[in-house]
């Protein structure tokens, strides 16, 4: 028989049956949750709008004159967004800005644009938070369950973040509309959620605000994938650092957050709360106010006995228990959760997934050799802040802590990210990234091969890379300068030099000027280029 939880607010009176055990199990009801949040500044997510297919490649950044004003947020020349995109209807509004639907003027494709008012970024911390959000979006884009980031643009009044438009609405809105689903369907949804946590942690990011509202459906199709959005509270993981600020949304906050002493394990807790809600319709710890919710979380009484739990599999309940263990050191990891029997026994699709790291390495393999060396120069000059996430990814792959990644470590690391590449394909990636042909990938080579191509938007990075080759500061890279620089890496043979010059020297004067160099570096910089994804 059905039942209804009305403790979430007197205004919610409708009952929606959801079958969560098997197709024949008795239905239970999903009661929409109120949204008490701990932190401010959350922007609303886009709702139903058409989603273009296939996924487009970003246009090259618009040219800017040397006299362009440098924006204080992004530290690069300011750009008039209206030259690139038309803004349309408002999709959501938050403390700092507004999200609009927008259209790319070059091809008519639709995206979401989060416009943040610079005058509302009063504190230095506000600016640092926005910069970090941009860096994390750049770092994580390309993952199958993370919203695609198109670019960040700054003008006199606003910072604009352009990203994929997810037109299917919020995850739980879809569940409410559907009315019922099976435990198997819940597992299919939940695997995507846990995969986001796993990939974030593997790539050195803790989300800190996982909740159903931050997962959107790509389209209105029945089998639409879901995407994680809103990384405004996310941070790069710093080895040994303990976080003390209370962030997140009340129902999903881990107990150690309330104790102001936590790490990445809080994301697993939040995901566990989401699974509990998926299977029961209510959160495990509830209250009428934030205070009473927090008290329930700290008290920690987990109910897996009363209805509907007798109809739900022991395997599902075992996973919930392991994700909601109060001691974060004993809590299951996201990687372990993905291997839990409840996740693996439901015959979820085994379709290969291309991780962002893998896609970038495939791109890198396709680049000409001058571009590879130039990227290495850029990588060597990036700040610790800019490569924080990649540093953690490298450490996760370098399992023997030797300071280099072997073929076996690369293969195992890509496998943990969901790759199904063959031995020969991984060998090709290895050879492409191993610039000095040592047989292993060192830290700089790894950063070179996997850093996000948004780094190429920074003029100062391109200038420094050009100077590395232009030894006499003539404004041109001559054949001799090219040969000298490339010989250091065993690439200085005449055939390679001819190949590079023929590819880059578009005005056929036998040398490479700065404009030709920049065009080469910015060519094909999307992480979603279908030609580079197998």
From Swiss-Prot:
Record's compositionally biased regions (Pro residues): 49-63
Lipidation (N-myristoyl glycine): 2
Primary residence: membrane
Autoinhibitory domain, as annotated region: 348-378
Modified residues (Phosphoserine): 249
Alphabetized Pfam families for the sequence: EF-hand_7, Pkinase
Calcium as UniProt keyword: yes
Record EC number: 2.7.11.1
UniProt: Ca(2+) 2 binding residues: 434, 436, 438, 440, 445
Keyword entries, A-Z: ATP-binding, Calcium, Kinase, Lipoprotein, Membrane, Metal-binding, Myristate, Nucleotide-binding, Phosphoprotein, Repeat, Serine/threonine-protein kinase, Transferase
Compositionally biased intervals (Low complexity): 16-27
Family statement: Belongs to the protein kinase superfamily. Ser/Thr protein kinase family. CDPK subfamily.
Role: May play a role in signal transduction pathways that involve calcium as a second messenger.
Protein name: Calcium-dependent protein kinase 29
Lineage, highest ranks first: Eukaryota, Viridiplantae, Streptophyta, Embryophyta, Tracheophyta
């Amino acid at each position: 028989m059905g039942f209804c939880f009305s403790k979430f607010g007197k205004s919610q009176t409708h009952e929606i049956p959801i079958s969560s055990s098997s197709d024949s199990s008795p239905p239970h009801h999903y009661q929409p949750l109120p949204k008490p949040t701990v932190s401010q500044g959350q922007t609303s997510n886009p709702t139903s709008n058409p989603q273009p297919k296939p996924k487009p490649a970003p246009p090259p950044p618009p040219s800017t004159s040397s006299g362009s004003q440098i924006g204080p947020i992004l530290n690069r020349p300011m750009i008039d967004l209206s030259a690139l995109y038309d803004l349309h209807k408002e999709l959501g509004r938050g403390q700092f800005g507004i999200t609009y639907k927008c259209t790319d003027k070059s091809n008519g494709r639709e995206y979401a644009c989060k416009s943040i008012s610079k005058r509302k970024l009063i504190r230095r911390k506000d600016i640092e938070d926005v910069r970090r959000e941009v860096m994390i979006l750049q770092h994580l884009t390309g993952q199958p369950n993370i919203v695609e980031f198109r670019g960040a643009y700054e003008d006199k009044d606003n910072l604009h973040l352009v990203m994929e438009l997810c037109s299917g609405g919020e995850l739980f809105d879809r569940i409410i509309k559907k009315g019922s689903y099976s435990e198997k369907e819940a597992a299919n949804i939940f695997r995507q959620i846990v995969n986001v946590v796993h990939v974030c942690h593997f790539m050195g990011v803790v989300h800190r605000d996982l909740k159903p509202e931050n997962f959107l459906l790509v389209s209105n199709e029945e089998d639409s994938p879901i995407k994680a959005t809103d990384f405004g509270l996310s941070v790069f993981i710093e080895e040994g650092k303990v976080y003390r600020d209370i962030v997140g949304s009340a129902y999903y906050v881990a107990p150690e957050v309330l104790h102001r002493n936590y790490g990445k394990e809080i994301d697993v807790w939040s995901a566990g709360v989401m699974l509990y809600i998926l299977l029961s319709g209510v959160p495990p710890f509830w209250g009428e106010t934030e205070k009473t919710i927090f008290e329930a979380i700290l008290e920690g009484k987990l109910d897996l006995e009363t209805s509907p739990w007798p109809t739900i599999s022991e395997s599902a309940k075992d996973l919930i228990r392991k994700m909601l263990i109060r001691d974060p050191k004993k809590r299951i990891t996201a990687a372990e959760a993905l291997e839990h029997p409840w996740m693996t026994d439901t015959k979820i699709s085994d379709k290969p997934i291309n991780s962002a790291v893998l896609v970038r390495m495939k791109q890198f393999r396709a680049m000409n050799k001058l571009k590879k060396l130039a990227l290495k120069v850029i990588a060597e000059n990036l700040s610790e802040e800019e490569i924080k996430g990649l540093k953690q990814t490298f450490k996760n792959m370098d399992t023997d802590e030797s300071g280099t990644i072997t073929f076996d470590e690369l293969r195992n690391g890509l496998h943990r990210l969901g790759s199904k590449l063959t031995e020969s394909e991984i060998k090709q990636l290895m050879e492409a990234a191993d610039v000095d042909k040592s047989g292993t990938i060192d830290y700089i080579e790894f950063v070179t091969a996997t850093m996000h191509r948004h780094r190429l938007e920074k003029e100062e990075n391109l200038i420094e890379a050009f100077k590395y080759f232009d030894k006499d500061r003539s404004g041109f890279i001559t054949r001799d300068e090219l040969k000298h620089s490339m010989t250091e890496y065993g690439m200085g043979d005449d055939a390679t030099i001819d190949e590079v010059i023929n590819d880059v020297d578009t005005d056929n004067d036998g040398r490479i000027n700065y404009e030709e160099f920049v065009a080469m570096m910015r060519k094909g910089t999307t992480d979603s280029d279908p030609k580079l994804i197998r």
